[in-house]
Amino acid sequence: MSNRQWLLAARPETYPQPEHFQLVAGDRPALEPGKALVKTLFLGVAPVMLRYMRNETEFQAPLAIGDLMMGRGVAQVLASDCPELPVGSIVQARLGWQEYALIDIRQNPPPFLLAHHDLPYSHGLSSLGPSGFTALIGLREVGAVQSDDHILVSGAAGGVGSQVSQIAKALGAQKVVGIAGGADKCRRLISDMGYDEAIDYKQGNINTALDQLFSQGIDLYFDNVGGALLDEVLSRLRRRARIVICGAISEYLLAREAQHRFANLQNLGRQDARMEGFFVFDYGQHYPDYASEIADWIRAGQVSPVEDISRGIETLPLALSDLYTGSNVGVRMVHVADPDPMP
């Protein structure tokens, strides 16, 4: 049986395009001792993948030309020599861009079972996967969110941003403002994602909007964008504010010398504030607990996954490109296949 795979064909100078990838067909891998053979159901895409492609990441081995594109997904276990990954189970794991994969419980972070089979499997890449976990970790473990915080979120219509306000509200937050580009995205921030107010950075003056909505300052900023916007937030911090650094998509395409030079970093000291980044995969041992907690919020109607799904493994390059053209809303993923019937 064949196994279609996407390989890295060239390093992009700007955002990923179809010509940077090559679709090949190989053989389905055979089961190996201590591992599980899985069938890919869904694959997710994330902005950080561009850094892998451009050999710019410090926390992951770089991709060489001809390597399998890396990525996380949801899969069904077809055969297993690993008792922790029984046949028929649904797992979320690092699979790569391919239809079948061998996974190992010793991977870091390890695969984990999606025990919430009453919920759609796609949620394993959104609320019950990297996006939801990133939002929860950033808000609670890093940002120490409080009920009276005035919270601002950049990149609010993206995969992580679509979860931040909802999870913040589930944790007790009262006011969350999101920033996105375009009237439709801003409308959806309020109607679908739990935001109280939306700032359209494509319309009007964003600094004026910040001054109006945060006249007393910002307590917690969940940053997915970086750059000049982060600098503006630094100038508007309340005492003991927290800035959670999740991403910097506004600067991923810029050469180092073209990136923003900060003028307001000293305000961290003046306001006894804190700015901290984190790596979601460092919390892998807690994933099952996070998934159980968020699943309860989904069932209670407190969290609603926002997913942007295309069908077919051949659509993966376009799905990744969408993250840089601003055309996606929510967690961008690809439905690769349906699960096999199991006895």
Spans of features found by a protein language model:
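C-terminal capping/lid region of NAD(P)-dependent oxidoreductase domains
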Residues: 3, 302-309, 317-343
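Glycine-rich beta-strand-centered segment in the early N-terminal region that forms part
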Residues: 28-45, 53-97
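NAD(P)H dinucleotide-binding glycine-rich loop of Rossmann-like/cofactor-binding domains
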Residues: 69-76, 83-155, 302
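Short glycine/proline-centered loop/turn elements that form peptide/ligand docking sites
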Residues: 80-84, 178-188, 202, 206, ...
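N-terminal Rossmann-like NAD(P) cofactor-binding module of classical short-chain dehydrogenase/reductase
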Residues: 92, 152, 199, 221-222
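Mid-domain Rossmann-like dinucleotide-binding core that forms the NAD(H)/NADP(H) cofactor-binding site
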Residues: 124-203
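Glycine-rich phosphate-binding loop and adjacent beta-alpha segment
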Residues: 173, 189, 228-303, 338-343
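Short amphipathic alpha-helix with an adjacent loop that forms part of the alpha/beta core around
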Residues: 206-216
